[in-house]
Amino acid sequence: MSSAFRTVWWEAGQVCLIDQRLLPNETSVVRCTTVEEVARAIRTMQIRGAPAIGCAAAYGMALAAHHAASTATDGDHQQVYDQLAAAKTILDAQRPTAVNLSWATRRVQEKVRRLIPAAPNTLARAALEEAHAILAEDLAMCYAIGRHGVALIPPRGHVLTHCNAGGLATAGYGTALAPIRMAHEQGRPIHVYVDETRPFLQGARLTAWELLQERIPMTLITDTMAGHFMQRGAIDCVIVGADRIVANGDVANKIGTYSLAVLARAHGIPFYVAAPSSTIDLSLPNGEAIPIEERSPDEVTTCFGRRIAPEGAVAAHPAFDVTPSHLVTAIITECGVIYPPFEEPLRRVVAGSE
């Protein structure tokens, strides 16, 4: 098992990431030297995907700690902690639906808090070590999701996926793409139907790119074609990622996921959600409580810088929707596959990850 590329990493005191807005036509690395630059990269979707932005935010926290330590006196641990608190506020505000973001910043903040009153440089090193740990753990969780999920792929291996829940959305290897990658590595038949995922085209630009890099057979379709291919018997199962899974098993994911779940249920097709424990939020009872990010309508009315709707057209742009738990066949986590009712299994997964 391997990850063909790095999504986000720390290098020479900078947070480095692949600019996903430019893929597949250009591979460019963004180098962030301030918390504000990391926040902007998350907000503008230079990096996206719940686990990946969690990793980026963790490194943003490490960046804040290092900057604070560089100007603090030997005993001024409070300056480091205050800068971390300010950085957490900035980073958490960028993408409200993905719970991995606040989960990661809280982990770094808590790691530093437990070491106070250590010297500022010690606190900064601890922040970076925790960010490295979050990245390594995410990659390990992705591999585990692949191992648990591969058995769910039917023998013919025709899988529909939505948005991008691959290596680009994580520390590497992916969530929804992890079982698919593993099936391919095992030499099993696999063919992926990739929703283009309007309006940001994560499926067309990113998932298709990842699959082609590894020569995994795929067919790109528009979002509105999914029902047709289900009706014709071309789809064996659906596997998607998640940005937040709440206590009852409701799932927030890229807009259009709910529609796929309804279609899958209507056609008797299994609908699987692949996500690490860091995406589970037991503090919210159900999907009605999940904050849904509203992005700029310009992302709907324009495409690659060109307007595709008439002037004056009013557009809506909720970036995510919520799939009710009763439409989810199973959730694939690093701890195993869990089935409804989800409440108790989700609690066990979270408890096992702590």
UniProtKB/Swiss-Prot annotation:
Residues annotated for substrate binding in this entry: 48-50, 95, 202, 253-254
Gene3D superfamilies given in the database record: translation initiation factor eif-2b, domain 1, Translation initiation factor eif-2b, domain 2
InterPro entries linked to this entry: IF-2B-related (IPR000649), IF-M1Pi (IPR005251), IF_2B-like_C (IPR042529), Initiation_fac_2B_a/b/d (IPR011559), M1Pi_N (IPR027363), NagB/RpiA_transferase-like (IPR037171)
Keyword match Transmembrane helix: no
Documented EC number(s): 5.3.1.23
Active-site residue numbers: 243
Catalysis: reaction(s): 5-(methylsulfanyl)-alpha-D-ribose 1-phosphate = 5-(methylsulfanyl)-D-ribulose 1-phosphate
Pathway involvement of the protein, from the record: Amino-acid biosynthesis; L-methionine biosynthesis via salvage pathway; L-methionine from S-methyl-5-thio-alpha-D-ribose 1-phosphate: step 1/6
Keyword annotations from UniProtKB, A to Z: Amino-acid biosynthesis, Isomerase, Methionine biosynthesis
Positions bearing the site annotation: Transition state stabilizer: 163
Coiled coil start-end: none
A molecular-function term among this protein's GO annotations: S-methyl-5-thioribose-1-phosphate isomerase activity
A GO BP entry: L-methionine salvage from methylthioadenosine
PANTHER family: METHYLTHIORIBOSE-1-PHOSPHATE ISOMERASE
Family assignment from sequence similarity: Belongs to the eIF-2B alpha/beta/delta subunits family. MtnA subfamily.
Role of this protein: Catalyzes the interconversion of methylthioribose-1-phosphate (MTR-1-P) into methylthioribulose-1-phosphate (MTRu-1-P).
HAMAP family on file: Salvage_MtnA
Name of the protein in question: Methylthioribose-1-phosphate isomerase
Organism: Roseiflexus castenholzii (strain DSM 13941 / HLO8)
